[in-house]
């Protein structure tokens, strides 16, 4: 595999898509006959180690995926940054790239993930290492319920603000 680690954020309840009512973690929602998380781990099978950050109803994810992956627990859902921090023990003695993705993104492919990794490697080759390479999209419809990418005047990444927390100005941003 590729000398790289991947963190899959899969602790969420999925309130907006009704998973919580079903008693299922968001990443275990069925898409085309399989849980979303299954597609994500399959597409990331090229990496050295996959760490899943689990929380709500975590046993369902453990039971489905088994012990071929590493697990970190996010007891309280305190946001994306906190979820990544919950996996930090797996990087204590690691100095390589870490790909962070979401357990509810079943349509991202190996090809896309490898392009992100290549962009990071290219930045190193140019002697200008990127602290972060981010995959985002610009949506035509800003009314969709996604976190918005906030950038500064130089277009550098600042933060992601989840849709329910966005002010009116942030809701106009089309980059998610």
Task: Mark where each language-model region is.
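Conserved N-terminal catalytic core of the sugar/cofactor nucleotidyltransferase
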Residues: 1-5, 16, 30, 34-118, ...
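Histidine-centered beta-alpha loop that forms part of the nucleotide-sugar donor binding/catalytic region
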Residues: 11, 55, 103, 137-138
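Short N-terminal binding/cap micro-motifs at the start of the first secondary-structure element
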Residues: 14-18, 143
